[in-house]
Structure formats: C-alpha cells, structure tokens
Amino acid sequence: MQARAQGQARASSPARAQAQPPSLRGRALRLLGRREFSRAELESRLRPHTESPEELHALLDELAERGGLSDTRFAEALVRQRKDRYGKRAIAQRLKQAGVSAEDTAAALTGMDADTEFHTACALLQRKFRHPPTDDKEKARQVRFLQARGYTIGTTLRVLKASVTAPDC
C-alpha cells in the first residue's frame, strides 16, 4: 500500500514542476545561497530569465539594500579563496572581470603585501616542483608557472633565487 502511494506521488510531481517556472527573485536567492556573486555577475546570470531590465535592476537594488548582495563581500570572499594559489595580479584581474570597483578591489587586497605574496609563491612552488631548478629550461618552466598564477616578475625571481639557496624558502 505504501509503495502505491509513493508511485502516485511521483506521477503527480512532474505535472507540478511544469506548472510554474521559478521567479526572478527565487533564482537570485538560490544563486546567492550557493556562493557570493558580484552585482555584475548576478545580473548576467539573471538577464536571460527576464524581459524587463528595469525589473532586474530593481531586484538587484533591493538585494543590495537588504545586504544579500555586496561587491565588497564578494571581493573579500574571492581573495580568501584564492590567496594561497594566486598572486595579487591574478586576483585583481578576476575581480575586475567580475565587475568589482577599483576601491573594493584595493580594500580586499590590503592584506596581501609583498612578504605575504613571497611566502605563498614559495610554498606554491615547493608544492608543485619540490626541487629548485637545475637548468635554464626548468627555471623557465617555473618562472612561467608563477607568472601564469599572477605573481610579478620581481616576486618570481626572488622566489627562485631563495629556492636555490634555501630549498624550503
């Protein structure tokens, strides 16, 4: 008897799912419930689901007023998430792509000074390569790796020099 009741419940659920698509607000809250979004990112995600740009901007303004949407909070979360794997330049570029203002970007990156960046680059290089470069080809490979991760050439060369003299930086 219980199996039949479950079967009937399953049969009615597809009809219920087709009844009404989620509202714009529901979509926004579902996305924001998963992770932080910048205003520009959330707008681009929601734009295909609305006919009226005014409705979308009104919703985004309301979410920002209520504290559900914050570029500052998004920037801080992104920096926290990426600071151990990427340099300041790469993180700043990602924030710029996400539409975060220069002021919010600068505020979020204040904790990443040159020494912090040096130590994270050192740790990253040790995890990836384990040994200092033995020839020019290997050195170029390690330089490219750190450059692709957003570290400046100055930091990269300091890290390589330190890894040769003291393998544990």
Where are these regions (language model features)?
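An alpha-helical, amphipathic repeat domain used for nucleic-acid recognition
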Residues: 1-169
